[in-house]
């Protein structure tokens, strides 16, 4: 190939690569926007916020568990990018999913593997208050990607956390 032909092929390759990169960026931004909107909708929900602020929920508040679980199960919160949504309540030391209730140590093990190190990682995760952040953890060759939103979304000590486990292939 002549120099001009190689240059033309290279220019075409660069144009195609740039177009593909733009499409990927748009898709990623749209996906993260949906995930963030779902998390903020949960964080701003009055039922969830009120429950998170109770110092020690009573047995009568257990009905609220089912209400909150149904909110987690709504279609907007189960997009293809999100594998699972956990709603961790500091006051209970428990996390809810659409179907299950986890103790704090069991949740740490599910997210980060068994052992004391997983509890330490979970404690670090819940010590930072944030509107929406994406964090990754790698352990034993497996990478966990989490979108984390605090309730309340500002302040030094969150009373609850929304943890969205993201599909690394998505």
Model-inferred region functions:
Residues 7-12, 41-45, 145:
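Short hydrophobic/aromatic-rich motifs at helix boundaries and adjacent loops
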Residues 5, 50-53, 170:
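Short alpha-helical interface patches
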Residues 1-22:
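N-terminal membrane-insertion alpha helix
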């Amino acid at each position: 190939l002549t120099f001009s032909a190689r240059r033309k092929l290279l220019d075409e390759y660069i144009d195609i690569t740039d177009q593909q990169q733009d499409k990927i960026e748009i898709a990623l931004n749209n996906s993260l926007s949906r995930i963030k909107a779902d998390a903020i909708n949960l964080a701003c929900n009055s039922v969830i916020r009120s429950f998170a602020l109770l110092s020690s929920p009573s047995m009568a508040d257990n009905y609220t568990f089912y209400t909150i679980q149904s909110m987690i199960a709504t279609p907007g919160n189960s997009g293809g990018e999100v594998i699972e949504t956990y709603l961790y309540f500091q006051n209970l030391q428990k996390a809810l999913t659409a179907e299950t209730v986890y103790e704090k140590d069991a949740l740490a093990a599910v997210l980060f593997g068994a052992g004391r190190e997983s509890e330490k990682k979970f404690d670090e995760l819940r010590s930072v208050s944030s509107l929406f952040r994406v964090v990754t953890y790698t352990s034993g060759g497996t990478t966990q990607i989490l979108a984390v939103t605090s309730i309340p979304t500002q302040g030094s000590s969150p009373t609850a956390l929304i943890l969205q486990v993201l599909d690394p292939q998505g």
